[in-house]
């Protein structure tokens, strides 16, 4: 995988992470990248969600965006997502980016906690 141009350099500041994988609709990956780089990342930060890193796959043909978010704990995750999803700026950005149809076909996510021996 390669970091996207808008990704921060990965650094694990938090102990709780979320790996999210989005399968974009055919031809919509550039629009998804645009929404993340111009709207989503800033809104995540506004709501206390740490942007760890964003990747695309190097091998094969893929419409996949893989990214990692960080939180101090599960309660912070719930509060961050609740605030993000109800934010009028997010709702406006999402609606505008999906004027011509949905950008994401399938999304998956996993909550991960660093092990004691993991480098930080």
Residues covered by each model-derived region:
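Short, surface-exposed ligand-recognition loops at beta-strand->loop->(often short) alpha-helix junctions
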Residues: 24-33
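Acidic/histidine-enriched, glycine/proline-rich intrinsically disordered or flexible terminal extensions
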Residues: 113-120
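Short hydrophobic/aromatic beta-strand micro-patches
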Residues: 23, 68-70
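Short acidic/glycine-enriched loop/turn segments that link adjacent beta-strands
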Residues: 60-63
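Trp/Gly-enriched beta-strand/coil motifs that build multi-repeat beta-propeller-like domains
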Residues: 55-56
């Amino acid at each position: 995988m390669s970091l996207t141009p808008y990704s921060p350099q990965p650094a694990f500041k938090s102990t709780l992470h979320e790996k999210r994988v989005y399968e974009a609709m055919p031809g919509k990956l550039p629009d998804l990248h645009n929404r993340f780089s111009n709207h989503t990342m800033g809104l995540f930060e506004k709501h206390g969600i740490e942007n760890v890193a964003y990747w695309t796959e190097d091998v094969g043909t893929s419409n996949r965006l893989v990214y990692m978010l960080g939180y101090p704990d599960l309660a912070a995750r719930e509060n961050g997502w609740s605030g993000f999803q109800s934010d009028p700026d997010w709702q406006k950005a999402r609606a505008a980016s999906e004027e011509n149809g949905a950008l994401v076909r399938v999304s998956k996510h996993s909550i991960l906690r660093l092990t004691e021996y993991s480098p930080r």
